[in-house]
């Protein structure tokens, strides 16, 4: 997520027009901001690293937990319900990558998904007014 019309902005737009939003509670991932990926790319370039690297924020959450935190940080009171439908919409139930190569090369890992989202929302809410 980052600038543009992605999951955060789409969810907030839905919160403006829908009284209740259903979000999968059985699909797990590690939401990662574009800013955190950019920081890792910079560190890889500094180290002149090569190879295949995964770069994801720390921690795991469901899409429901991610959406709940977005709405809370945005001050939205929209009701949000868990929908259990892993696999029905083409999304795997567990989609968490491992930062193994970053750890092996001693490259600083991205922050937790909560910290990254908090920072993103703080800046985005200022920008959005």
Stretch-by-stretch model annotation:
Residues 2, 29-32, 61, 97, ...:
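Residue-level signal for the nucleotide or nucleotide-sugar donor/cofactor binding architecture
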Residues 37, 41, 55, 66, ...:
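Non-catalytic, hydrophobic alpha-helical segments
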Residues 113-129:
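Amphipathic terminal alpha-helices
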Residues 40, 47-88, 93, 128-129:
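Mid/C-terminal beta-alpha module of Rossmann-like enzyme folds, strongest
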Residues 7-11, 34, 38, 63, ...:
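A general structural signal for well-ordered alpha-helical segments in protein cores
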Residues 1-29, 35-36:
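NAD(P)-dependent short-chain dehydrogenase/reductase
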Residues 16, 35-46, 121:
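Two-component system phosphotransfer/interaction surface
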Residues 87-105:
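A hydrophobic C-terminal alpha-helical subdomain
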């Amino acid at each position: 997520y980052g600038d543009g019309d992605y999951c955060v902005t789409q969810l907030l737009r839905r919160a403006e027009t829908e009284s209740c939003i259903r979000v999968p509670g059985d699909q797990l991932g590690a939401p990662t901001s574009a800013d955190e990926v950019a920081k890792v790319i910079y560190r890889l370039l500094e180290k002149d690293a090569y190879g295949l690297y995964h770069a994801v924020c720390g921690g795991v959450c469901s899409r429901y937990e991610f959406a709940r935190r977005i709405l809370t940080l945005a001050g939205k009171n929209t009701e949000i319900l868990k929908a259990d439908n892993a696999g029905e919409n083409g999304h795997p139930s567990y989609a968490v990558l491992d930062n193994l190569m970053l750890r092996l090369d001693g490259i600083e890992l991205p922050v937790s998904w909560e910290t990254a989202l908090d920072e993103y929302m703080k800046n985005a809410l200022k920008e959005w007014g």
